[in-house]
UniProtKB/Swiss-Prot annotation:
HAMAP family: PSII_PsbT. It holds the Pfam family PsbT. Belongs to the PsbT family. The chain crosses the membrane at residues 3-23. GO terms for cellular component: chloroplast thylakoid membrane; photosystem II reaction center. This is Photosystem II reaction center protein T. It is a single-pass membrane protein. It is found in: Plastid, Chloroplast thylakoid membrane. Disulfide bonds: none annotated.
Length: 35
């Protein structure tokens, strides 16, 4: 059970960090708008 808990915590932490960076610095690759 410890492996499951550690995996969940790791994924949660990585997700929070990823979303924090993503929302703080919006992606600069507007491919769809560029025609």
């Amino acid at each position: 059970m410890e492996a499951l808990v550690y995996t969940f915590l790791l994924v949660g932490t990585l997700g929070i960090i990823f979303f924090a960076i993503f929302f703080r610095e919006p992606p600069r690759v507007p491919v769809k708008d560029k025609k």
